[in-house]
Amino acid sequence: MERQVQRLRQTFRSGRSRPLRFRLQQLEALRRMVQEREKDILAAIAADLSKSELNAYSHEVITILGEIDFMLGNLPELASARPAKKNLLTMMDEAYVQPEPLGVVLIIGAWNYPFVLTLQPLVGAIAAGNAAIVKPSELSENTAKILAELLPQYLDQDLYMIVNGGVEETTELLRQRFDHILYTGNTAVGKIVMEAAAKHLTPVTLELGGKSPCYIDRDCDLDVACRRITWGKYMNCGQTCIAPDYILCEASSQDQIVQKIKDTVKDFYGENVKASPDYERIINLRHFKRIKSLLEGQKIAFGGETDEATRYIAPTILTDVDPNSKVMQEEIFGPILPIVSVKNVEEAINFINDREKPLALYIFSHNNKLIKRVIDETSSGGVTGNDVIMHFTVNSLPFGGVGASGMGAYHGKYSFDTFSHQRPCLLKGLKGESVNKLRYPPNSESKVSWSKFFLLKQFNKGRLQLLLLVCLVAVAAVIVKDQL
C-alpha cells in the first residue's frame, strides 16, 4: 500500500494533475464513464440495495452528473487567483489568494448510496488538482467491484486508484500519510479515521450521521408535510444519513400524522409494500437484526412486519415513544419512524438541544418566523424547512455535519475548497525602502505611530482613491525618511 501511495505522490509532484485543461479532461472522462456504462452501474447499485434501476438513477447517478457539470462550468473561476485587499504599506504590491491542490487524498465511501457518496467527493478532488485513492465500502460489494473495473479505464491510473477490501485494507490505508481524508459513515469509525489522521496531522472531513429531528407545527398543511416526510423517511428503506429520524409534534396532531403517513405509504408502494419495486431492502443481516431489535417494547401504530430471509422491514411508525428508550438513543438508519409528543415549539427546541447536534433538521410550519426561530435556537449540519432531504441536492449549499454529526463540508464549490489550500501570495517590489524602514530596528514611538497609519488603513481600487493614496504615501514616505 505504501508503494501505491508513493506512486501517486510522485505523479502528483510531477505536476501532471495541476493544469486546468487536464482537470477538465479527467472530469469529462468521468462523465463519459457514467453515461457509457450507465446500465452496468445501475445494475450494481440495484444488486447491492434491491433498488430499482429507476431509483438508482434518480437517487445517485443524476447527482453525480449534476456535480460534474457544475465543476466543468465553474472550474476556471474556482481555480483562478482572487485579488486580496491591501493596506497602505502594500498598496503598490500584488496580493492575491491562489487555490492549490493538497496532494494525495483518501476518500472512504459509504454503502447506503455507494455510487454518489464515493464519487461525488472524487469530483471535487479531481477539480482541485489532487491525486486520489478511493476506498468504496465493502458492504456494497457490487458497486465497489464495478468502480474498480471502470475507473482505471477512464481516469489516469497514475493519479486515481480504487482500493477494495474490508477492515484490514482500510486499516492499512489509514497507516499511510495523506494530505486530506474524507470519510462518510458512522461516528465510531469516524473516530478511528480521525485518530489515524492525527498521527500525520492530516486534515479530515467527516460526514457522519445522527438522529435528524423533524418538528411538525400544528399550523401546517399535514397532507403535504406527511407526504414529504414519508418520501424522505422510507426512501432507500430508511438507510439515508439525513432521513428524518423521528418526529416531534403536539399530542393533538399525532393521530392525524399517523393516518396520513399510512395513507401515503399505500399511495407510494401499494397495498403490498413488500412487492413494490420502489421499496428497497436492508443492506445485510447484521443491520436487519439491529433495526428489528429497536421494535422491542415499542407501541407499533403502523407496520412492524419483518422477513429475515429477504431482509424486509415494513415502513413502521411508533407512537408514545419514551425519549429514553433504545430507539431514541441511536441513529435508526432504517424504516422505523418514532413520534415523540411535545407541548410546544419551546419544548421541541429544548428536546433537540439536549441531544447531540444532528446532521439535518426539518421544520414544517406555515409560520416562517417559527421556522427561523427553530433555526436560530438550535444547531445542525443542515436545515430544510417544509421539506426533507432536499438541501442535499443544492450544490451551491455546503453539505456536512457539526459536532457529533461530522466536520467539514463538500458539494459544488465547497468540494473544491475542501480539497484545496487557499494560498496567500504577496509580491513586492524592491523599491520603497524608506517606508520599509518602519519595520527595521531600532524601534521608536515615531515608527509605531507611522506603522499604525500604514497597516490599519485598507483601500479599494477606485481610480481617484488610488491616485490620492499614491500621493499620500509618497508624501508620507518623504516625511518618514526625514524623521528616520
Curated annotation (Swiss-Prot):
The modification Phosphoserine is found at residue 293. The chain crosses the membrane at residues 464-484. It holds the Pfam family Aldedh. Residues 1-463 are cytoplasmic. PROSITE patterns: ALDEHYDE_DEHYDR_CYS, ALDEHYDE_DEHYDR_GLU. The active site is at 207, 241. Gene3D superfamilies: Aldehyde Dehydrogenase, Chain A, domain 1 (3.40.605.10), Aldehyde Dehydrogenase, Chain A, domain 2 (3.40.309.10). NAD(+) binds at residues 185-190. Keywords: Endoplasmic reticulum, Fatty acid metabolism, Lipid metabolism, Membrane, Microsome, NAD, Oxidoreductase, Phosphoprotein, Transmembrane, Transmembrane helix. GO terms for cellular component: cytoplasm; endoplasmic reticulum; endoplasmic reticulum membrane; intracellular membrane-bounded organelle; membrane. GO terms for biological process: aldehyde metabolic process; central nervous system development; epidermis development; fatty acid metabolic process; formaldehyde metabolic process; hexadecanal metabolic process; peripheral nervous system development; phytol metabolic process. It is found in: Microsome membrane; Endoplasmic reticulum membrane. One of its GO terms (molecular function) is long-chain-alcohol oxidase activity. It catalyses: an aldehyde + NAD(+) + H2O = a carboxylate + NADH + 2 H(+); a fatty aldehyde + NAD(+) + H2O = a fatty acid + NADH + 2 H(+); (2E)-hexadecenal + NAD(+) + H2O = (E)-hexadec-2-enoate + NADH + 2 H(+); hexadecanoate + NADH + 2 H(+) = hexadecanal + NAD(+) + H2O. Its main location: membrane. Its EC number is 1.2.1.3, 1.2.1.94. InterPro entries: Ald_DH/histidinol_DH, Ald_DH_C, Ald_DH_CS_CYS, Ald_DH_CS_GLU, Ald_DH_N, Aldehyde_DH_dom, Aldehyde_DH_NAD(P). It is a single-pass membrane protein. A motif (Prevents secretion from ER) lies at residues 481-484. Catalyzes the oxidation of medium and long-chain aliphatic aldehydes to fatty acids. Active on a variety of saturated and unsaturated aliphatic aldehydes between 6 and 24 carbons in length. Responsible for conversion of the sphingosine 1-phosphate (S1P) degradation product hexadecenal to hexadecenoic acid. Belongs to the aldehyde dehydrogenase family. This is Aldehyde dehydrogenase family 3 member A2. It comes from Rattus norvegicus (Rat).
